[in-house]
Curated annotation (Swiss-Prot):
The cysteine framework is III (CC-C-C-CC). One of its GO terms (molecular function) is ion channel inhibitor activity. Transmembrane segments: none annotated. One of its GO terms (cellular component) is extracellular region. This is Conotoxin VnMLKM-01. It is found in: Secreted. Keywords: Disulfide bond, Neurotoxin, Secreted, Signal, Toxin. Disulfide bonds join C55-C65, C56-C69, C61-C70.
Length: 70
């Protein structure tokens, strides 16, 4: 009887939990699909946007500015 209870618990509780798709996985897949549907120019703009950096203000500048901005 104990073996049957263990088998029922595994198949009715643990197996469905292991096969559920987590909600956290959904946005990543949706983002990848939306990104695939973008034009190459839009994709390029998104990829290059984080690299763009404006000049810092002279008041904030310390000796760490290597780009000659300060």
């Amino acid at each position: 009887m104990l073996k049957m209870g263990v088998m029922l618990f595994i198949f009715l509780v643990l197996f469905p939990l292991a096969t559920l798709q987590l909600d956290a996985d959904q946005p990543v897949e949706r983002y990848a699909e939306n990104k695939r549907l973008m034009s190459p120019d839009e994709r390029r703009a998104i990829l290059h946007a984080p690299r763009q950096r404006g000049c810092c203000e002279p008041d904030w500048c310390d000796s760490g500015c290597d780009d000659g901005c300060c």
